Amino acid sequence: MTSAWSNEIQHEGLKQWIQEVAELVTPEDIRVCNGSDSEYAEVYSIMQKSGVAIPLNSDLHPNCFLVRSSPEDVARVEKFTFICTAKKEEAGPTNNWRDPQEMRQELQGLFRGCMRGRTLYVVPFCMGPLNSPFSLIGVELTDSPYVVCSMKIMTRMGAEVLKSLGTSGTFHKCLHSVGVPLSPGEKDVAWPCNPEHMRIVHFQDDSSVMSFGSGYGGNALLGKKCVALRLASYIARSKNWLAEHMLIIGVTNPEGQKKYFAASFPSACGKTNLAMLKPKIPGWKIECIGDDIAWIRPGSDGRLYAVNPEYGFFGVAPGTSEKTNPNALATCRSNSIFTNVALTPDGDVWWEGLTSQPPAGLIDWRGNPWQPGGTPAAHPNSRFTTPLQQCPVLDSQWNSSEGVPLEAIIFGGRRSDTIPLVYEALSWQHGVTIGASMSSATTAAIVGEQGKLRHDPFAMLPFCGYNMALYFDHWLSFASNASLKLPKIYGVNWFRKDKDGNFIWPGFSENLRVLEWIFRRTNGEESIAKRTPIGYLPEESSLNLEGLNLSSQALQDLLAVDVPGWLKEVADVREYCKIFGSDLPQIISDELFRIERELK
């Protein structure tokens, strides 16, 4: 192994770590990534030669390729995702905890020799704008070319980051391997992975990540969920900021007044659709800062400011269409990676929901000829990885080092009953209780059962890097700082169904009508809302429903306070919160009691 790579690195601590890792994992070669387009093309051609990357029709999707993963490696694996803290209580009841010393020993065993016959890529990345006080720098060491190409799209990656790191800057150590060493002369498989031994491990003592056995998205692109949420949420608590699973949008009304909102939904509940919403109501404009992660800090003026630490979108493909999200389709037209979607005979991509009828002659996500009526042609959690800057409705402040001031925070989930279309929290404490009470029908973004209701507080259940009860407490602490001008908090639910099981609300671009009401509320319009035990609900006449074919009964159903339903909801949340024991903040118990008392 030559040491030519070490000449490219001025940071002694980084050099030493790479050397230590190389001695453990014994790669054939080491390559420091510079993030250039030519490097991307070269690494992509390696993937093409190995058979994992299929170039798409360059007239339809220039500089795009399709990747098929192993059927055993298609989503985040929560049961193999661990948080290591000195004490189990620090990780809390919602995380898989392991003792850091024991886990390090176990991982040493797994990583020993795991990159034999492969290249170790050094991937320096920055979450957040370079040189922003918000940002965190990481270095991912990986043996996956797919990770290298994806990290170029999803993060600010390469030589600029190394330059910013200097000779002594702080960085997060992120070690990743697909976990499949190659013997001399052994032919590689298209998508190497090691499902028996998958581990995605977060060490909070030194803010590092080690991931083994999976090459898929959130398990392997360690800047995303691992650093930007699981590590960052832990860091944020001690430094008085928030790392959240939220989209960020700019909303401009016909008068030209602009406000920024953040919104939190569990995976596959429409974050990307809302982040890129195309308004049908004349004069309104929605612009996107991010669709998945928000880092939020108090600014010098007391308002909360948000940045998107990411540089790309990693969107769920199925259901994305010209009707549901034309801006997403425009974004991933070029320079994008498609994973586990179907392939058409003319070299284009397809997935369920893209068109009403599937084209003939599809090859499915497993690489087999596909016939309608059987299993889906595209995997339900198939993805597009695409640059942020290609979004046609990208907000001008997308790269602001200070972030944008939030005027509303929105919590939502996939609920067929009880939860109304929109309601406003009576206070910050009530708003935190709304976030803590979130539950949603599960989707394909996680391995396991789909369609059952699971509690997902703040949509952070899989991503909070410490005890969630202490996380609630951290949110509540913002109210005790009198100098802060906190945003209003809202609950929304696009997914209410009628007795025949049909969605009552049309959703998608029509969700702007709800954002319009929220916008007016943040302007202090009192007469458009009425106080109820569960929050301020819209007066029926205050929602702009012009051009919508919505019956008065449907509107009543969407805005009703279902007393028996809510009493059951409160009881259910209270039961769930028992897992936190005495760590649960008293304020949340008090809010639940208040809602119950007022309902009765």
Swiss-Prot record:
Substrate binds at residues 76, 216-218, 267, 381-383. CDD domains: PEPCK_GTP. SUPFAM superfamilies: PEP carboxykinase N-terminal domain (SSF68923), PEP carboxykinase-like (SSF53795). The active site is at residue 269. GO terms for cellular component: cytosol. PROSITE patterns: PEPCK_GTP. Binds 1 Mn(2+) ion per subunit. Its EC number is 4.1.1.32. Its cofactor is Mn(2+). GO terms for molecular function: GTP binding; manganese ion binding; phosphoenolpyruvate carboxykinase (GTP) activity. GO terms for biological process: cellular response to glucose stimulus; gluconeogenesis; glycerol biosynthetic process from pyruvate; oxaloacetate metabolic process; propionate catabolic process; response to lipid; response to starvation. GTP binds at residues 268-273, 383, 414, 508-511. Mn(2+) binds at residues 225, 245, 292. Pathway: Carbohydrate biosynthesis; gluconeogenesis. Keywords: Cytoplasm, Decarboxylase, Gluconeogenesis, GTP-binding, Lyase, Manganese, Metal-binding, Nucleotide-binding. It catalyses: oxaloacetate + GTP = phosphoenolpyruvate + GDP + CO2. It comes from the Bacteria. Belongs to the phosphoenolpyruvate carboxykinase [GTP] family. Monomer. Catalyzes the conversion of oxaloacetate (OAA) to phosphoenolpyruvate (PEP), the rate-limiting step in the metabolic pathway that produces glucose from lactate and other precursors derived from the citric acid cycle. This is Phosphoenolpyruvate carboxykinase [GTP]. It comes from Chlamydia felis (strain Fe/C-56) (Chlamydophila felis). The lineage of its organism: Bacteria, Pseudomonadati, Chlamydiota, Chlamydiia, Chlamydiales.
